[in-house]
């Protein structure tokens, strides 16, 4: 039971850190390379 409580307390922390870093990475990619879904007609 103690291991289950440890797992349930660690999993939200790790998922919050993971999704937070993923969101920051996506924000920085979109800041450096804006409009990734549109194809430029000329470079």
Curated annotation (Swiss-Prot):
User: Belongs to which family?
Assistant: Belongs to the PsaJ family.
Q: Which GO terms describe its biological process?
A: photosynthesis
Primary location? plastid
What job does the chain carry out? May help in the organization of the PsaE and PsaF subunits.
- On whether ATP-binding is a keyword of this UniProt record, the answer is no
Q: Which residues cross the membrane?
A: 7-27
Give me the disulphide-bonded residues: none
Annotated keywords = Chloroplast, Membrane, Photosynthesis, Photosystem I, Plastid, Thylakoid, Transmembrane, Transmembrane helix
Tell me the Pfam families matching this sequence.
PSI_PsaJ
Record GO cellular component, one term: chloroplast thylakoid membrane
UniProt keyword annotation of Glycoprotein present: no
Locations listed in the record: Plastid, Chloroplast thylakoid membrane
**Under which name does UniProt file this protein?**
Photosystem I reaction center subunit IX
What membrane topology is given?
Answer: Single-pass membrane protein
The record ties this protein, via InterPro entries, to: PSI_PsaJ, PSI_PsaJ_sf
């Amino acid at each position: 039971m103690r291991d289950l409580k440890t797992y349930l307390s660690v999993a939200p922390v790790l998922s919050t850190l993971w999704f937070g870093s993923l969101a920051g990475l996506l924000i920085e990619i979109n800041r450096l390379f804006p409009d990734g879904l549109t194809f430029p007609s000329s470079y």
